[in-house]
């Protein structure tokens, strides 16, 4: 007899969404749908969640113990996610910021994205309204580097096609994390693509979770214009992170 594969339930983003005392074997198949059989696949892979963050949830993400404001905001956002799938509540965007890197912004952003993916999956199982493309993670700093390389290689290069493909994925997803926005000055060409993405999402009423090391009010100086910064701040709640770097605590 073939033995069913086992897994560590503490790594599953479903762990806080199933009834207490549920035998993990009962939701192994659902775990695989989200994480993949090897832990590298499933819905989280499709959403481009970095591997180190795929086990996180807003209930126990490491930075929250030291970030009171962020912890309260995470709880509110989790509640709103549930209302979204139950009653169609329209979600707002969130702007997670701190002056110091490594305070847990990306960690919490991914934890929230994981939660949204899990709730979307459960809504689908229950026959409730859900999203075909629920979520996507985009590292804006890396995306800008990809753009610079693509421009150097030409508009018909494979690199430019890959850059545009990420733009399309981030436009299609209902919820997106735009990580490290405003981390460095943007060229006019890249800024145009970033504005296209942000504007399309705002116009479609799709929520975005931004992370940044600059406050919203400082974005015009980083971008060299106010138009894009204003779009980022539209229908968006700012959440401040404090303290020094906590990297290594994931």
Feature annotation, model-predicted:
Residues 1-83, 237-239, 243, 247-250:
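A short, basic N-terminal segment
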Residues 80-92, 123-129:
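Short helix/loop segment immediately N-terminal to the Walker
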């Amino acid at each position: 007899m073939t033995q069913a594969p086992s897994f560590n339930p503490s790594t599953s983003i479903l762990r806080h969404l199933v009834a207490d005392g549920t035998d993990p074997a009962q939701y192994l198949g659902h775990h695989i749908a989200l994480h993949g059989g090897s832990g590298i696949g499933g819905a989280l892979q499709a959403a481009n969640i970095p591997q180190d963050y795929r086990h996180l949830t807003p209930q126990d993400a490491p930075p929250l113990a030291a970030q009171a404001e962020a912890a309260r905001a995470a709880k509110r956002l989790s509640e709103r996610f549930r209302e979204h799938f139950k009653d169609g509540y329209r979600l707002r965007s969130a702007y997670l910021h701190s002056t110091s890197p490594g305070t847990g912004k990306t960690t919490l952003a991914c934890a929230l994205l994981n939660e949204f993916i899990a709730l979307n999956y459960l809504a689908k199982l229950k026959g409730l309204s859900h999203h075909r493309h629920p979520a996507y993670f985009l590292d804006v700093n890396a995306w800008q580097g990809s753009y610079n390389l693509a421009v150097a290689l030409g508009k018909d290069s494979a690199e430019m096609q890959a850059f545009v493909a990420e733009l399309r994925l981030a436009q299609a997803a209902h919820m997106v994390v735009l990580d490290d926005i405003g981390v460095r000055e943007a060229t006019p060409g890249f800024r145009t693509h970033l504005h296209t993405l942000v504007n399309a999402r705002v116009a479609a009423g799709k929520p975005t979770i931004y992370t940044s090391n600059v406050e919203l009010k400082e974005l015009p100086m980083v971008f060299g214009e106010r138009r894009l910064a204003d779009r980022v701040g539209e229908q968006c709640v700012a959440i401040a992170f404090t303290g020094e770097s906590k990297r290594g605590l994931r």
